[in-house]
Protein backbone atom coordinates (compact mmCIF):
# COMPACT_ATOMS: atom_id res chain seq x y z
CA UNK A 1 0.00 0.00 0.00
CA UNK A 2 2.84 2.40 0.83
CA UNK A 3 4.44 1.65 -2.53
CA UNK A 4 1.21 2.53 -4.33
CA UNK A 5 0.79 5.66 -2.22
CA UNK A 6 4.39 6.72 -2.86
CA UNK A 7 4.00 6.12 -6.58
CA UNK A 8 0.81 8.21 -6.62
CA UNK A 9 2.43 11.06 -4.66
CA UNK A 10 5.42 11.01 -7.01
CA UNK A 11 3.20 11.40 -10.08
CA UNK A 12 0.97 14.15 -8.67
CA UNK A 13 1.65 17.77 -9.67
CA UNK A 14 3.36 19.67 -6.85
CA UNK A 15 0.41 21.99 -6.23
CA UNK A 16 -1.91 18.99 -5.82
CA UNK A 17 0.45 17.38 -3.31
CA UNK A 18 0.54 20.65 -1.40
CA UNK A 19 -3.27 20.80 -1.41
CA UNK A 20 -3.41 17.20 -0.17
CA UNK A 21 -0.97 18.09 2.63
CA UNK A 22 -3.13 21.03 3.64
CA UNK A 23 -6.24 18.81 3.64
CA UNK A 24 -4.39 16.23 5.74
CA UNK A 25 -3.32 18.87 8.26
CA UNK A 26 -6.89 20.17 8.48
CA UNK A 27 -8.30 16.66 8.98
CA UNK A 28 -5.82 15.94 11.77
CA UNK A 29 -6.46 19.24 13.54
CA UNK A 30 -2.95 20.54 12.87
CA UNK A 31 -2.41 24.22 12.09
CA UNK A 32 -2.69 25.29 8.46
CA UNK A 33 0.50 26.02 6.56
CA UNK A 34 1.56 29.66 6.37
CA UNK A 35 2.42 31.27 3.03
CA UNK A 36 6.12 31.01 3.91
CA UNK A 37 5.82 27.33 4.79
CA UNK A 38 3.93 26.59 1.57
CA UNK A 39 6.59 28.41 -0.45
CA UNK A 40 9.42 26.50 1.25
CA UNK A 41 7.70 23.15 0.76
CA UNK A 42 6.98 23.86 -2.90
CA UNK A 43 10.60 24.90 -3.45
CA UNK A 44 11.79 21.45 -2.38
CA UNK A 45 8.77 19.38 -3.40
CA UNK A 46 10.71 17.40 -6.01
CA UNK A 47 13.14 16.09 -3.39
CA UNK A 48 10.33 15.51 -0.89
CA UNK A 49 8.25 13.50 -3.37
CA UNK A 50 11.21 11.26 -4.25
CA UNK A 51 11.33 9.83 -0.72
CA UNK A 52 7.67 10.10 0.26
CA UNK A 53 5.56 7.00 0.63
CA UNK A 54 2.75 8.71 2.55
CA UNK A 55 1.58 12.25 3.29
CA UNK A 56 2.68 11.98 6.94
CA UNK A 57 6.10 10.83 5.72
CA UNK A 58 6.32 13.75 3.33
CA UNK A 59 5.36 16.14 6.14
CA UNK A 60 8.06 14.63 8.34
CA UNK A 61 10.67 15.30 5.65
CA UNK A 62 9.28 18.83 5.18
CA UNK A 63 9.56 19.60 8.90
CA UNK A 64 12.58 21.85 8.26
CA UNK A 65 10.30 24.13 6.21
CA UNK A 66 7.71 24.43 8.96
CA UNK A 67 9.82 25.10 12.04
CA UNK A 68 10.68 28.55 13.34
CA UNK A 69 13.91 29.92 14.72
CA UNK A 70 15.62 29.21 16.90
CA UNK A 71 15.63 25.62 15.69
CA UNK A 72 15.27 23.11 18.51
CA UNK A 73 17.97 20.51 17.85
CA UNK A 74 17.15 16.89 18.65
CA UNK A 75 19.60 15.09 20.94
CA UNK A 76 21.03 12.86 18.20
CA UNK A 77 21.54 15.86 15.89
CA UNK A 78 23.15 17.89 18.67
CA UNK A 79 26.05 15.41 18.68
CA UNK A 80 26.95 16.77 15.23
CA UNK A 81 27.35 20.27 16.64
CA UNK A 82 30.60 20.02 18.57
CA UNK A 83 33.09 22.89 18.80
CA UNK A 84 34.97 21.84 15.64
CA UNK A 85 31.75 21.49 13.63
CA UNK A 86 30.46 24.84 14.84
CA UNK A 87 33.78 26.37 13.79
CA UNK A 88 33.32 24.98 10.28
CA UNK A 89 29.75 26.34 10.23
CA UNK A 90 31.10 29.77 11.22
CA UNK A 91 33.54 29.64 8.30
CA UNK A 92 30.79 28.49 5.94
CA UNK A 93 28.42 31.21 7.15
CA UNK A 94 31.05 33.85 6.35
CA UNK A 95 31.71 32.28 2.93
CA UNK A 96 28.00 32.36 2.06
CA UNK A 97 27.34 35.99 2.97
CA UNK A 98 27.70 37.47 -0.50
CA UNK A 99 27.86 34.67 -3.07
CA UNK A 100 25.19 33.33 -5.36
CA UNK A 101 22.45 31.32 -3.67
CA UNK A 102 22.18 28.64 -6.34
CA UNK A 103 22.34 24.99 -5.31
CA UNK A 104 25.61 24.49 -7.22
CA UNK A 105 27.26 27.55 -5.65
CA UNK A 106 26.16 26.47 -2.16
CA UNK A 107 27.59 23.01 -2.70
CA UNK A 108 30.88 24.39 -4.05
CA UNK A 109 31.23 26.73 -1.06
CA UNK A 110 30.60 23.85 1.35
CA UNK A 111 33.14 21.65 -0.45
CA UNK A 112 35.74 24.43 -0.21
CA UNK A 113 35.16 24.86 3.54
CA UNK A 114 35.32 21.09 4.08
CA UNK A 115 38.59 20.85 2.10
CA UNK A 116 40.07 23.80 4.03
CA UNK A 117 39.32 21.88 7.22
CA UNK A 118 40.74 18.61 5.90
CA UNK A 119 37.42 16.75 5.98
CA UNK A 120 35.01 15.32 3.45
CA UNK A 121 31.76 17.07 2.60
CA UNK A 122 29.80 14.62 4.77
CA UNK A 123 31.64 15.84 7.89
CA UNK A 124 30.30 19.33 7.15
CA UNK A 125 26.88 18.26 5.85
CA UNK A 126 25.94 16.53 9.12
CA UNK A 127 26.32 19.62 11.34
CA UNK A 128 24.84 21.76 8.56
CA UNK A 129 21.74 19.50 8.52
CA UNK A 130 21.52 19.64 12.32
CA UNK A 131 21.68 23.45 12.30
CA UNK A 132 19.14 23.88 9.49
CA UNK A 133 16.66 21.12 10.36
CA UNK A 134 17.41 20.27 13.97
CA UNK A 135 17.62 16.57 13.15
CA UNK A 136 19.74 14.00 11.37
CA UNK A 137 17.30 13.25 8.53
CA UNK A 138 16.07 15.75 5.99
CA UNK A 139 16.25 16.51 2.30
CA UNK A 140 19.66 17.48 0.94
CA UNK A 141 21.20 20.35 2.88
CA UNK A 142 21.55 22.29 -0.36
CA UNK A 143 17.88 21.74 -1.26
CA UNK A 144 16.96 22.96 2.22
CA UNK A 145 19.14 26.05 1.87
CA UNK A 146 17.65 27.01 -1.47
CA UNK A 147 14.12 26.46 -0.12
CA UNK A 148 14.78 28.43 3.07
CA UNK A 149 16.56 31.22 1.25
CA UNK A 150 19.71 33.12 2.17
CA UNK A 151 18.36 35.12 5.11
CA UNK A 152 16.71 32.21 6.95
CA UNK A 153 19.54 29.75 6.24
CA UNK A 154 22.23 32.12 7.46
CA UNK A 155 20.15 33.03 10.52
CA UNK A 156 19.75 29.34 11.45
CA UNK A 157 23.48 28.79 11.02
CA UNK A 158 24.26 31.90 13.06
CA UNK A 159 21.96 30.71 15.86
CA UNK A 160 24.01 27.53 16.17
CA UNK A 161 27.43 29.14 15.82
CA UNK A 162 26.49 31.71 18.49
CA UNK A 163 26.06 28.79 20.91
CA UNK A 164 29.73 27.91 20.43
CA UNK A 165 30.88 31.29 21.73
What are these regions (language model features)?
Residues 2, 15, 42, 46, ...:
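Non-catalytic, well-ordered alpha-helical scaffold segments
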Residues 2-29, 111, 147-165:
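Non-catalytic terminal extensions that flank enzyme cores
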Residues 2-7, 46-54, 119, 130-134:
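Core structural elements
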Residues 9-12, 56, 133-140:
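Short helix-capping/linker segments at secondary-structure and domain boundaries
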Residues 13-117:
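Small-residue-rich helix-loop
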Residues 104-164:
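Charged substrate- and nucleic-acid-binding regions of tRNA-handling and nucleotidyl-transfer enzymes
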